[in-house]
């Protein structure tokens, strides 16, 4: 290490780390016997104190004592102020040699070697003599946790009684050795070099004997010994101990009689291999320097830590931060001792220096330790919580000499007075900068400009104030980055003038009773201020590029007499003032209708925003692969269109012979790269006439005889012969039956839709009707329609079709001549005849047997169905069949504008 004796011999670290023999007990009043010269060369020997009165409590290594001119390292003394303590030496190191120690019985010298570390001593005046009489008492009256080490008068000067060169911390010493500790001739560079050399030798010695952790940082080191280690028997608890315990704590054997001076060393101190101890290690303090001597009081000694058996080892530190190490503004004023949680990111000491804040506070012996993070600082008081509205429920009545400021929240209605924005501005307006020309007045959403009206007062003209306000979630106030801009010109109809109120530009207009106290705001634009000019203001915290939304704020003061006014205020919807082009895109919010015939020609009305006079509406269709298949521009009616409404004519679809609805899309374009999102639209197929179908359409009846007329009266699709007809897919028949085809149905079974008008060859496309899908509904009975070609009378046999119907109401066909009575449950042929045209709005498409039918109908007949019953044909002839056919043809109603068939 360095020269520690007059013979410049090296200190032997083996004995320091527990390799020497047991030394005889030390005398109570002086030093113990020196080491035998033949056993070992002059070396360090630790003189340990007696176990503390709290029984096997760890002994903390205190700081070195303050220097006293002309004396050697006195015992620690309490400071005058309670709760603070002056430095204490760590322990005595007895050097073997021919010289005798001060007050010692032998020739050994005692060297106070605080952990073999170099540390700074804050020179302060000697403590008061009144406190020297009780060196073992704490300021709070509690006994000291450990006694001072033996031979407290170490640190001999060079050439002293024992002779030899050794450390001298006293400023009064005149040693010129570079190893003299803080001597007059020492400098900081020499101290740092000594620290580096001592630390390297300590690390080498510890690694040689394996007495410590190989980890570099003591705070990250594991336990320096295991619980089975006999040295751990002297610890106060079996809990895990951090490496700082091995640096800072000494253990003592079992309880022994307490004594102010120890009788003999009771254990060896162990060191961790590397790293820096916590603040209790007497390392060079950042606060202690050569240039600061005499400027600061001595730091207090570390307080012993009462360990919590359940607390983890890395949190066990010894040493209380001196009150001087905490800034005055953050010093804790309470009398409680708090322990700050260690920070893993704290750097280790460098050259014997510890970072500020590395010292830990401890509680008095026996007290529980409080680990509260951040207790080095006073709690910051919470900011004052302002109410959301400063006036709360106060009435908006003010004196004319003390009008409310612009950031004062005001209601829009008070009693009968109300300030209302009749027409709101649109949601986007491009504000202009100070270096460019005006971009015009703020526009309204439906076109034109905003309109403001005062309700409940029309006695005399009033002044309407307008300014640009904020649009965030906070209280309404003047906007810092935008101001109102006065617009003038031939097209401006509203007179206005500018004023400045509390640094905010205000536009003032007049509300006239002849205008119903309304004003058209066509004279107000928005001016954008430079962000840098505003952000550099004192107290401004907003950022300009993030505050681009504003509101138009209108305020009026209505006089009430007696020098009082009622102030009401109204704010518009938020307005986006940025120059982003996305805000200028047209938007379609609604449109009607949503479907049209493929022939087009219908009027389509679009509602949205940002529509221009030259806006276009384009219909497109894309294929499954996404390729454009059809594109057509619609014709826009400019006379009926404005900024929020577009009226146009739907164009024709490219294919007019579609049999199902076609999905297309349209969009509004304000120019290149300014298109609205696409909207869906449907083109529907149209109703068309067909040529008369062949006789195969009349299939489904047993007879193969031809009809006496060539007109197709079958309103149902062609169907196979009767045996397979009941098993048809009902979804194919539903569109037609839903329109009322198949009207000869008993009321017991439901049927939907009105009866059709007679039109030859009329057929609707299935896609224009709602289908029921392929789900099989409950089966119902269905009566086929009779035809004159049916030789069996067309009484209609019942068979299951499986279609849902609603129950119809009965109707009365024209009366027929009397005929033989009918036996059977089925109605006569006349039951399925349609009504004349004037009867459609009154009755349904059919009726059941004997329900609403005249007596002639009930008695007519003489024939029966040949399908389901065995009633024989009685007395029917071919002439009667022809007569019935003629009556049937004359009974069909004619549609409007057409003559019935002859």
Swiss-Prot record:
IPT/TIG domain mapped to chain residues: 586-683
Region (Calcineurin-binding): 114-119
Domain RHD: start-end pairs: 401-582
Post-translational modification, as annotated: Phosphorylated by NFATC-kinases; dephosphorylated by calcineurin/PPP3CA. Phosphorylated on Ser-168 and Ser-170 by MTOR, IRAK1, MAPK7/ERK5 and MAPK14/p38, on Ser-213 and Ser-217 by MAPK8/JNK1 and MAPK9/JNK2, and on Ser-289 and Ser-344 by RPS6KA3. Phosphorylated by GSK3B. Phosphorylation by GSK3B markedly increases NFATC4 ubiquitination. Phosphorylation at Ser-168 and Ser-170 is stimulated by UV irradiation. Phosphorylation determines subcellular location: the hyperphosphorylated protein is cytosolic, while the dephosphorylated form is targeted to the nucleus. Ubiquitinated, leading to degradation by the proteasome. Ubiquitination may be stimulated by GSK3B-dependent phosphorylation. Polyubiquitin linkage mainly occurs through 'Lys-48'.
Motif segment (Nuclear localization signal): 268-270, 672-674
Region called Disordered, residue ranges: 16-180, 208-369, 791-870
Pfam families (UniProt xref): RHD_dimer, RHD_DNA_bind
Record location of the Glycyl lysine isopeptide (Lys-Gly) (interchain with G-Cter in SUMO2) cross-link: 689
DNA-binding region range list: 430-437
InterPro entries per UniProt: Ig-like_fold, Ig_E-set, IPT_dom, NFAT, p53-like_TF_DNA-bd_sf, RHD_dimer, RHD_DNA_bind_dom, RHD_DNA_bind_dom_sf
Segments of skewed composition (Gly residues): 96-109, 151-165
SMART domains assigned to the protein according to its UniProt record, in alphabetical order: IPT
Tissue specificity note: Widely expressed, with high levels in placenta, lung, kidney, testis and ovary. Weakly expressed in spleen and thymus. In the hippocampus, expressed in the granular layer of the dentate gyrus, in the pyramidal neurons of CA3 region, and in the hippocampal fissure. Expressed in the heart (at protein level).
Residue numbers spanned by region 2 approximate SP repeats: 213-293
One of the protein's GO biological processes: positive regulation of transcription by RNA polymerase II
Subunit-structure text: Member of the multicomponent NFATC transcription complex that consists of at least two components, a pre-existing cytoplasmic component NFATC2 and an inducible nuclear component NFATC1. Other NFAT proteins, such as NFATC3, or members of the activating protein-1 (AP-1) family and MAF can also bind the complex. NFAT proteins can bind DNA as monomers or dimers. Component of a promoter-binding complex composed of STAT3, NFATC3 and NFATC4; complex formation is enhanced by calcineurin. Interacts with CREBBP; this interaction potentiates transcription activation.
The protein's name: Nuclear factor of activated T-cells, cytoplasmic 4
Organism: Homo sapiens
Organism lineage string: Eukaryota, Metazoa, Chordata, Craniata, Vertebrata
